[in-house]
Amino acid sequence: MTEADAPAPGTAPGSAPDASPPSPSSPPSPPYLFDVTGAGHREAAQELRARGPAVPVQLPGGVLGHAVTRHHALRDFLTHPEVAKDASHFAALREGRIPPGWPLTTFATVDGMTTADGADHRRLREPAVKALSPRRVAALRPRVERLTAELLDGLPALAARGGGTVDLRHAFAYPLPMRVISELIGVDEEFRDRLHQLSGLVVSTVIDPEAALAANRELVEVLGQVVAARRAAPGDDLTSALIAACDEADARLSERELIGTLLLMIAAGHQTTLDLITNAVRALCAHRDQLDLVREGRADWADVVEETLRHDSPVAHFPFRYPTRDLDVGGTVIPRGTPVLASYAAAGRDPEAYGPDADRFDVTRRPAVRRLSFGHGPHVCPGAPLARLEARIALRALFTRFPDLDLAVPEAELRPLPTFVGNSAAELPVRPGRDVGTAGQDGSATSPGAG
């Protein structure tokens, strides 16, 4: 099929877009076809939500699934007792109909808490919950503040070398959460950049099968090296604790589960925060009036973080859950064993939950419902408090020190990440502008606009 023959995003091959609602006698609409390049996230979310609370979708490789797209339907689906995370319920995978190198395989098959249910899920989740306890996260605040200040110290020189511009995603939004989670987990510096690159490849939806298989193999190899380094020199970190659980006589963790847990902690522990910070900076630069509200004390940095999570969720469509029986979701029956996406991007702008102006970025918004961007129920992200803390500290320090910071290109020209699972810009070129120095960078919660 040539590029000219390719279907428009949102339309299965051989069909044409149709914005009009079907009449009662109309045949079912074709499954929604995701744009694997990650382009048009906002338009995709709008169309998915308009089609209904549960929408048939076509995933890469022609695999059929569903997406749950509206806030209340998604909230209920995420806690439904007859919805599973264990891929043994994934009918097409179980029956051998998923080809090798399928780009979404890792989401279904990684051995960890995101693919387990019941007692197994609680067992695999426990180490992460302990490592990310409220007391542990609160104790990390000074370290996050110091790292933030160090990274901001380097921005003027980087911008000077770039003719006044710098890629804020690469220079600030990435290294901050990667350093924090690596220190918490026990990942030596030599492994961090490669783990970031590989975790990006395994969530890409444009990767070819051979490259996907190679990336997964290398990711397991590098994580094995991380484990070997900690076995040789244990420390007060999560990896050392996981190794101890794996090596004890009544091993509470298998070697595969150890690797899978590390993969999830490293990937989710930095990528979501990286995208959250990137999206928040993009939104504030595009909506300077909202930044002014924070500076005037009419909103705080926690409000910015929460509104970014709702309005521009770092995770757009998260794989997978599987009904264990045919399940009616808002009038649509999802067949047993179907892979289902949690469409946080669509649910975050649901007018039924957030009002008729749900598409508007408004840091003073006080919704009556809880945001779902970090999940809901037993599988809610255990790293959410740390991600929120990092983002609040990063945004406050960034815009305090560089009050004139702005995008170096029009927002519409920002290139998306090559995936429909995650949602962010692949680069964030900015002009930092004047540097007012380190005054007010102590992170005090009593200062104006503190988070």
Identify the residue ranges that each predicted region occupies:
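Cytochrome P450
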Residues: 1-451
